[in-house]
Amino acid sequence: MAKTAQFYILTENCTLTVEEIACNLAASIWRSGKKVLISCESEAQALEIDERLWQRDPNEFVPHNLSGEATQYPTPIEISWLGKRNLQRRDLLINLQQEIPDFSHSFTQIIDFVPKDDALKTQARERYKQLRLQGWNLSTENVG
């Protein structure tokens, strides 16, 4: 199966944060029947994603958990951060880290972001180059 990576480019007109877009994408992907790992740069970012998912309208509830949380049943969306990740199988990786996670090879689909900030944009370009060199099929989409 071909490995694909989709980069979402936040344009100057975009009013959403990367975290908001990641939550919306995770919800949509889960509704299509896939299990998602959102890999955050920090625990603080993971907690922000967790809170955003809990704040959604009750009719749009998205079952999720933070890595390491005890749950009776596995949830379809896991939120992890550097150094903290369960080993449960997931279909798609939403990468919010500054680098490509070392476990990315276990996925066939990655979603990543190109923020507006120049330093973060440079890091995103490096991730794009890395994935291209590893043979991933890459695509981009403007947001905003």
UniProtKB/Swiss-Prot annotation:
InterPro entries: DNA_pol3_chi, PolIII_chi_sf. GO terms for biological process: DNA replication; positive regulation of DNA-templated DNA replication initiation. Its EC number is 2.7.7.7. It is an enzyme of class 2 (transferase). Transmembrane segments: none annotated. It catalyses: DNA(n) + a 2'-deoxyribonucleoside 5'-triphosphate = DNA(n+1) + diphosphate. SUPFAM superfamilies: DNA polymerase III chi subunit (SSF102400). One of its GO terms (molecular function) is DNA binding. Part of the beta sliding clamp loading complex, which hydrolyzes ATP to load the beta clamp onto primed DNA to form the DNA replication pre-initiation complex. DNA polymerase III is a complex, multichain enzyme responsible for most of the replicative synthesis in bacteria. This DNA polymerase also exhibits 3' to 5' exonuclease activity. This subunit may stabilize YoaA and/or stimulate the helicase activity of YoaA. DNA polymerase III contains a core (composed of alpha, epsilon and theta chains) that associates with a tau subunit. This core dimerizes to form the POLIII' complex. PolIII' associates with the gamma complex (composed of gamma, delta, delta', psi and chi chains) and with the beta chain to form the complete DNA polymerase III complex. Interacts directly with the psi subunit (holD). The only subunit of the DNA polymerase III holoenzyme known to interact with single-stranded DNA binding protein (SSB), interacts directly with DNA helicase YoaA. Belongs to the DNA polymerase III chi/HolC chain family. This is DNA polymerase III subunit chi. It comes from Haemophilus influenzae (strain ATCC 51907 / DSM 11121 / KW20 / Rd). The lineage of its organism: Bacteria, Pseudomonadati, Pseudomonadota, Gammaproteobacteria, Pasteurellales.
